[in-house]
Regions:
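Peri-transmembrane interface segments
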Residues: 35-39, 208-253, 262-266, 287, ...
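Hydrophobic, regular-secondary-structure patches
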Residues: 11-96, 209-213, 219
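Short beta-strand boundary microenvironments
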Residues: 41-42, 65-77, 81-147, 159-161, ...
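N-terminal Sec/SRP start-transfer signal
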Residues: 1-20, 30, 263, 289-290, ...
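Alpha-helical transmembrane segments of integral membrane proteins
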Residues: 14-24, 238-258, 295-303, 337, ...
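Interfacial "coupling" helices/loops that link adjacent transmembrane helices in transporter permeases
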Residues: 238, 252-294
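Short helix-loop junctions at transmembrane helix boundaries
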Residues: 237, 283-287, 300-360
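Small-residue transmembrane helix packing/gating motifs
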Residues: 46, 124, 165-205, 224
C-alpha cells in the first residue's frame, strides 16, 4: 500500500486506464441488456394477443360471428379494432403513428396491456382522451395532460387530451375510444383488424391457416413470427459486445504493460536488493505485481460508475425510428465487467512476470 500511494501519478494513470476498460465492458453488456429484451417484452407483456387478422374491408356482423365460432379450432378470445396510419403533430415536427380504435363493446385488457414505463397500469382512454407510446411522446415533447392533434392523409384532424404515456418498444401507437373517433371524424371507424388469443395447447400457425380461409381475410400475422424476426435482427448485438470486449482487453493490456514496465524500471535497485536478501523469483514478482491487482480492483470499481454514464450516453445516440430501447444494465453485467477486468489483469501479469523480472 505504501508503494501504491508513493507513486501518485502512476496510481491515477492505472486507475484511469483500468476504469476505462471496465466502463467499456459495462457499456457493451449494457447495450445488449437494453436491446435484446425489448422484443420479448413487446410480444409477451404489452401486445399479449397471439394472432392479428386483417380483413379487406370493414367486417360485417356475419364475419364477427364467423371468427367467434372458431372457438373449437382454438380461438379463446378475440376483439375487433380499427387500425389507421396517422400523423401525430408536435410543436416542431410530426411523427407517423398507428391509431388503434377498439370496438366499444369489447374489453382490450386481454389483448393489449397498457402500462407506464414504471409498470403502473393505464386504463383504456375514455371519450376525448388518448394513450400514446412513451417514445414518440418523448420525441415530440408531449406529456400527460397535454392536448395533441392527430391528422390523417385527408387532412382530417382529431384533437384529444393525453391521459397516459404507455411503454412500447416496437412501432408507435395511439389508442383512442370509438366515441372520440366518431365524434371528431364524423364517421364510424372501419373495423378491419382483429386480435386473437389462442387457447392453451393450440398451434397458432395451424389456427392461422384456418383463419386465413375465412371470407374476406387479407392477411394473418402470427405474433411469435414477429418476435422471432425482430430477435434475429437484434442478434447483431452479440457481435458488438464481442468487439467491445476485445477493445477493453486491448486497453487493459496497453495500460498494464506500459505502467508495469515503468514501475519495474523505476525500481530496479529496490528489486535487486530484495533478490539479494534471498527472496525467490516468485516472491519478488508477487511483491511487484500485487500492486497491479489492487489498482486494477480499484479501477474496476471506478469503471462501474463511469460505465453507467457512458452506457446512457451511447444509448442516447442510438436512434431507431419506430423502436424504443429499455435502457438499463443488469446487475450480472456489472459482475461480468469486474470479473473480465480482473481476468485481463491476471493474463497480462502472467505474460509479463518472467520477462519483466528477468529484465530487471
Amino acid at each position: 500500500m505504501r508503494n501504491i500511494f508513493r507513486y501518485k501519478k502512476r496510481f491515477f494513470m492505472m486507475v484511469a486506464g483500468i476504469s476505462g476498460c471496465s466502463a467499456l465492458l459495462v457499456t457493451g453488456f449494457g447495450v445488449r441488456d437494453s436491446v435484446t429484451g425489448i422484443v420479448t417484452q413487446q410480444y409477451t407483456q404489452i401486445q399479449t394477443y397471439d394472432i392479428g387478422v386483417t380483413y379487406s374491408s370493414s367486417v360485417t356482423p356475419e364475419q364477427k360471428s364467423e371468427l367467434e365460432s372458431k372457438e373449437q379450432d382454438g380461438v379463446e378470445k378475440s376483439v375487433f379494432v380499427a387500425e389507421k396510419s396517422m400523423d401525430l403533430v408536435g410543436s416542431e415536427k410530426t411523427k407517423s403513428v398507428s391509431l388503434i380504435v377498439a370496438d366499444p363493446d369489447s374489453d382490450m385488457t386481454p389483448f393489449v396491456n397498457l402500462h407506464t414505463e414504471k409498470g403502473v397500469p393505464i386504463t383504456f382512454p375514455k371519450k376525448g382522451e388518448a394513450v400514446i407510446s412513451a417514445k414518440v411522446a418523448d420525441e415530440l415533447g408531449i406529456k400527460t395532460g397535454d392536448t395533441v392533434t392527430l391528422q390523417d392523409s385527408d387532412m382530417k384532424t382529431i384533437s384529444v387530451a393525453v391521459s397516459g404515456l404507455c411503454e412500447n418498444f416496437v412501432y408507435n401507437y395511439v389508442y383512442l375510444s370509438a366515441d372520440t373517433y366518431e365524434e371528431q371524424m364524423k364517421t364510424e371507424p372501419e373495423y378491419k383488424n382483429a386480435f386473437v388469443c389462442v387457447s392453451e395447447g393450440t398451434d397458432a400457425h395451424l389456427l392461422g391457416t384456418s383463419l386465413m380461409a375465412m371470407s374476406d381475410v387479407a392477411a394473418v400475422n402470427i405474433s411469435q413470427d414477429d418476435m422471432e424476426r425482430f430477435s434475429s435482427m437484434m442478434g447483431s448485438m452479440d457481435l458488438i459486445v464481442v468487439v467491445i470486449i476485445l477493445c477493453a482487453a486491448g486497453l487493459a493490456f496497453i495500460v498494464l504493460y506500459n505502467l508495469t514496465n515503468i514501475n519495474i524500471t523505476e525500481r530496479v535497485c529496490e528489486i535487486a536488493t530484495i533478490e539479494v536478501l534471498g527472496f525467490y523469483e516468485n516472491e519478488t514478482a508477487a511483491y511487484v505485481f500485487r500492486e497491479n491487482t489492487i489498482l486494477t480492483f480499484l479501477g474496476a470499481l471506478a469503471g462501474l460508475v463511469l460505465g453507467v454514464f457512458l452506457h446512457r450516453f451511447v444509448m442516447s445516440q442510438i436512434v431507431v425510428d419506430m423502436v424504443a430501447f429499455d435502457v438499463h444494465v443488469k446487475p450480472v453485467s456489472f459482475v461480468y465487467s469486474v470479473v473480465l477486468t480482473l481476468v485481463f489483469t491476471w493474463f497480462v501479469d502472467r505474460l509479463m512476470r518472467k520477462r519483466s523480472m528477468r529484465s530487471a
